[in-house]
Amino acid sequence: IGQPDSVAISPDGSFAVIAIENERNEDINDEMIPQLPEGVLAMLDMTGGVQYVDLTGLADIAPSDPEPEFVDVNDLGETVITLQENNHLAVVDKGGNILNHFSAGWVELNNIDTKKDGVYNPVDSRTSRREPDAVVWIDNDHFATANEGDYKLKGYQGTHKRGGSRGWTIWNKDGTVVYESGATFETALAEAGFWPDKRAGKKGVEPESVTVGTFEGTRYIFVGAERADAVGVYDA
């Protein structure tokens, strides 16, 4: 068991969770998964002891090889975890039981630029898997994901081979989408001058990080776009 990708500590400080990805080797198997050993969620009791949560068999994509990417813990001790390459999400209680899991689905993107030609010309469309990277709880019932994408998968339910939806999503922990930015996140950055033209045909601005904060009584969501070298700020 190795290759930890993300660590979070419960708000009460009683335990930590680690997303152990066991990331695929892109130099073998044409970059495709499954590539065992599979990833797991490790839960470390701060007084001693560790529990491993089996995440196999959950996702539609490579169910034998879950690749957990990012974790966060809410005030109830519930962990939300992204399985990025598997395009899946799971919620686990503090006892290590899987409370819910669901596909991250895909997004119909319209008015995007998919051509590396030195100009921003948003006239294209694409159906893309979300493949979320970072995740953060907004409250005990909702969390947000930054849908970077990290996997090339041909012919999956009509989606583009490259994952990543160029935006971010707010979810209810029951799997319901509460808010979807679609292409508007990338559009706002491009119109502000943050457009990575070399990434147009791939994953665009690549939203990779997301966090929340409260300032003067207002809750905000911050979404980092790796390739655009920018951060979007939203009123939660």
Where are these regions (language model features)?
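Structural signal for beta-propeller blades
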Residues: 25-26, 41, 87-90, 152-153, ...
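Beta-propeller blade signature
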Residues: 34-47, 96, 161-174
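Residue-level detector of Asp-centered blade-edge/turn motifs that repeat once per structural unit
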Residues: 9-13, 73-76, 138-140, 214-218
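Beta-rich catalytic cores
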Residues: 2-5, 23, 37, 67, ...
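Short, conserved, GDST-rich strand-edge loop motifs in beta-rich repeat architectures
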Residues: 18-39, 145-166
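Surface-exposed loop and turn segments in beta-propeller and other repeat-based domains
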Residues: 1, 47-66, 100-126, 174-202
